[in-house]
């Protein structure tokens, strides 16, 4: 069954998590957001009503599972179920920020692997494939039993630092897990710049203790590269040790600006000169906080999935 004559098969929907990004992606596609209502009953249950006919259509639903994570996750699952039951030809879950990605392994034998469970739930709800950006660990790609498009924001983040003198900067990974990301950023911004790494410990969740740093940042403008800013504790600790090691200044960039309560205030009082994040999660630029747009990367991924453009690579290999 095909859509009516003259009607594109593409439908782009948004939940409540980040309608601004969804609208930007739709505009990049020369499309309008399709009609859907996602509301909450008085008892807290979520209701989804799809107003556009999705039968035999190619549906893309854009919904980061950012805070409140559980609410936005349930919204996404219910939307996928609604599309599937209404006869959509294909349902692609576009999840710019994948909540639960930091629970990708067990630290004790009696913990769940929450990131894997969420991947399973997406498949059960009706997702045909998933598009996401900068998962915490590359190994998480194996959690999905569906086709996965894993995008990376580094080219857009690097563009925010295009004006720096490559001879005067140093790139810093705030922990061992961010080294590959920092090295990839270095190749985009300043291929000859030194790369440093901060060694940290977490005595308790959301607490950070820096133990050491490797790499020469003396007299240089340091740029810390990470995937997520949550409490700001990691960035603050890394910035402090970088300055103690003789850096002239320190800035930071990350894909996902989660910004837990109090994080903005922590970073506003920090020595960081610039903090650059993307709009995978809704956040308003203010002061030293800058927000760059990744809508074009998602739009290009959608075009590639639909076979409309195949010559441009949108997913890079960053662990």
Indicate residue ranges for each PLM-predicted region.
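PRPP-associated nucleotide enzymes
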Residues: 1-319
């Amino acid at each position: 069954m095909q859509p009516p004559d003259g009607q594109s098969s593409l439908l782009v929907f948004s939940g409540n998590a980040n309608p601004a990004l969804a609208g930007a992606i739709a505009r990049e596609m020369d499309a309008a957001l399709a009609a859907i209502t996602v509301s909450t009953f008085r008892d807290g249950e979520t209701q989804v009503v799809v107003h556009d006919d999705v039968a035999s259509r190619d549906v893309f639903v854009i919904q980061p599972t950012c805070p409140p994570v559980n609410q936005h996750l349930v919204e996404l699952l219910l939307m996928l179920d609604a599309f599937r039951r209404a006869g959509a030809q294909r349902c692609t879950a576009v999840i710019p920020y994948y909540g639960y990605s930091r629970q990708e392994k067990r630290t004790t034998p009696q913990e769940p692997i929450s990131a894997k469970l969420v991947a399973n739930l997406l498949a059960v709800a009706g997702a045909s494939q998933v598009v996401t950006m900068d998962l915490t660990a590359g190994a998480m790609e194996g959690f999905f039993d569906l086709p996965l498009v894993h995008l990376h924001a580094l080219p857009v983040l690097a563009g925010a630092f295009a004006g720096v003198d490559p001879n005067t900067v140093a790139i810093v990974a705030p922990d061992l897990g961010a080294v590959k990301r920092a090295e990839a950023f270095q190749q985009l911004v300043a291929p000859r710049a030194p790369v440093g790494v901060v060694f940290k410990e977490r005595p308790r969740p959301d607490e950070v203790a820096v133990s050491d740093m490797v790499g020469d940042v003396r007299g240089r403008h340091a740029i810390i590269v990470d995937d997520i800013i949550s409490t700001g504790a990691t960035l603050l600790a890394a910035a402090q040790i970088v300055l103690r090691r003789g850096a002239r200044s320190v800035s930071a960039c990350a894909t996902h600006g989660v910004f837990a309560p109090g994080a903005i205030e922590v970073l506003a009082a920090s020595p960081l000169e610039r903090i650059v994040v993307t709009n995978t999660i809704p956040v308003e630029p203010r002061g030293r906080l800058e927000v760059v747009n990744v809508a074009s990367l998602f739009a290009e991924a959608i075009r590639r999935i639909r076979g409309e453009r195949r010559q441009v690579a949108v997913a890079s290999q960053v662990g």
